[in-house]
């Protein structure tokens, strides 16, 4: 219980003193993280059971869950995935389900089947995990018809 309260207060403090991501026109920014530690957190938290990261060989032996599809993170995108969006997707995965989200990963009440890691995920893991994931998105300019 206290760990949850401390984590919530730490996140609230960081949110209130955070600044806008210089690469984005909206959102907030936590301190810089470490992508390698983020990859380690991805493996430690067993995110690979439901997710793959575009262009990353995670070298895991097997998944504990046999979902038909993995949710792919990273890769080419036509819009910027802001720091704030990635943080929100981790701490509140049901906030906004992406178009094309696998139906087998949506609960009967319309929420994400993603486990709640708020009681186990540390702030440092969150910062590093977001840094790791954000580094694997590539912005692709939208196609303009007739050009």
Where are these regions (language model features)?
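Processing junctions and N-termini across compartments
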Residues: 13, 41-44, 108
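Short pre-active-site segment immediately N-terminal to redox-active cysteine/selenocysteine motifs
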Residues: 43-49, 54, 125
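C-terminal capping alpha-helices of c-type cytochrome domains
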Residues: 88, 109-147
């Amino acid at each position: 219980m206290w760990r949850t309260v401390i984590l919530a207060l730490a996140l609230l403090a960081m949110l209130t003193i955070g600044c806008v991501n210089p690469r984005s026109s909206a959102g907030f920014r936590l301190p810089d993280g470490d992508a390698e530690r983020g990859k380690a957190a991805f493996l430690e938290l067993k995110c690979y059971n439901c997710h793959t990261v575009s262009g990353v060989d995670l070298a895991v032996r097997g998944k504990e869950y046999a979902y038909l599809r993995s949710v792919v993170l990273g890769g080419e995108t036509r819009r910027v995935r802001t720091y704030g969006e990635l943080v929100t997707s981790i701490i509140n995965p049901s906030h906004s389900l992406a178009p094309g989200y696998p139906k087998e990963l949506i609960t009967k009440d319309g929420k994400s089947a993603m486990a709640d890691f708020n009681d186990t995920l540390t702030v440092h893991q969150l910062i590093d995990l977001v840094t790791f994931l954000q580094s694997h998105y590539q912005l692709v300019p939208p196609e303009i018809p007739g050009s």
